[in-house]
Swiss-Prot record:
Pfam families registered for this protein in UniProt: Trp_syntA
Domain of life of the native organism: Bacteria
Protein name, per record: Tryptophan synthase alpha chain
Family per record: Belongs to the TrpA family.
Entry GO MF terms: tryptophan synthase activity
GO CC, any one term: cytosol
Catalysed reaction equations from the record: (1S,2R)-1-C-(indol-3-yl)glycerol 3-phosphate + L-serine = D-glyceraldehyde 3-phosphate + L-tryptophan + H2O
Documented EC number(s): 4.2.1.20
Amino acid sequence: MERYQQLFKQLAAKKEGAFVPFVQLGDPSPAMSLNIIDTLIAAGADALELGIPFSDPLADGPTIQNAALRAFAAGVTPAICFEILAEIRQKHPTIPIGLLMYANLVFHNGIDHFYQRCAEVGVDSVLIADVPFEESAPFRAAALRHGIAPIFICPPNADGDLLREIASHGRGYTYLLSRAGVTGAENHGQLPLNHLVDKLREYNAAPALQGFGISEPAQVKASLAAGAAGAISGSAIVKIIEKNVAQPVEMLVQLTRFVTEMKAATRS
């Protein structure tokens, strides 16, 4: 959890926002997945948001679903994902690592065991996409027991009560949803979200990162202008992977270019 606090402190000192890429662990293969993640970090990613492939992803658009299918085809399992996570942490001791996933995978070997494994491999935060705040108590209790930040999604229509709850129980960062629906670069993030960010700040919530539909530098700038601490981009990155599965060198070149441009947009 402290890694997020450190990161936001360092970025504030440099007057920068955070750029956080999302990829599926093991896509398109475990070895290539590690290459991709090293490339994202080298290109300027401030933190990582990583998915554990799941067969029935409710909040994911086709791009992220296909990434899960590629990982499954390469034989990726949750156990292999934890091995990849341990390797990332060993190579990159300070970068915040967040998981974005589904409840079934948390339940699989018991909630407590799941968070214990996260702590062992150096994961900092977990966001469970299909658990609404009002059902989150057992998850957030287990998370805090193991020093993992529970992350909550703040929807664009959140009322004052929900914002207070998220502020009081969330740690690490707050996932600010650009809009309702499924993920995807085509579905542009709707801005501005100033009123939500202001309220979250008033209630002392963890810094807000805006996600869903963030695919170009101008949107990163707009997120920061609305008061968010940074932006998360998933589908646009996973698309680059998808288009270049057969040409890994070109894939890494394009990922480097994309992350470099998105990170540049966080510098005022």
